Amino acid sequence: MARKIKLVLGVIGSDCHAVGNKILDYSLTEAGFEVTNIGVLSPQEDFINAALETNADAILVSSLYGQGELDCKGLREKCDEAGLKGIKLFVGGNIVVGKQNFDEVHKRFTAMGFDHVYPPGTPVETTIKDLHADFPDHA
């Protein structure tokens, strides 16, 4: 039997939106993933430390208060410096201020090193599908 995909999940920065985080935690766990949920109000270092402690395969960052772009800057570089080079980075939610063209938002987050970038309202099934595609040996 294949090892479960290990995920670190949390809400970055000063964002305290907990309901979506709990829904993601439940849905991903039910789908067979091993989820470490660091909760809300989480700085980048908490994601990195949890990923190191759990030997995570991916970090899933959520943000709903619109400041995700600021909060996520430098995360890829910090992951690399901490020994997590190549860890998959996912981000989703209301990750920028105001209504912006999502193609442009996607480009900016991809340039920051994120592997998957999701707009508000993305079904969790999309993330699950992407996780299985990224880790076919664990599906």
Swiss-Prot record:
This is Glutamate mutase sigma subunit. Its cofactor is adenosylcob(III)alamin. HAMAP family: Me_Asp_mutase_S. It comes from the Bacteria. Keywords: Cobalamin, Cobalt, Isomerase, Metal-binding. The keyword Isomerase applies. CDD domains: Glm_B12_BD. Residues 4-139 form the B12-binding domain. Heterotetramer composed of 2 epsilon subunits (GlmE) and 2 sigma subunits (GlmS). GlmE exists as a homodimer and GlmS as a monomer. Its EC number is 5.4.99.1. Pathway: Amino-acid degradation; L-glutamate degradation via mesaconate pathway; acetate and pyruvate from L-glutamate: step 1/4. Belongs to the methylaspartate mutase GlmS subunit family. It holds the Pfam family B12-binding. Adenosylcob(III)alamin binds at residues 14-18, 62-64, 94-98. GO terms for biological process: anaerobic glutamate catabolic process; glutamate catabolic process via L-citramalate. PROSITE patterns: B12_BINDING. It catalyses: (2S,3S)-3-methyl-L-aspartate = L-glutamate.
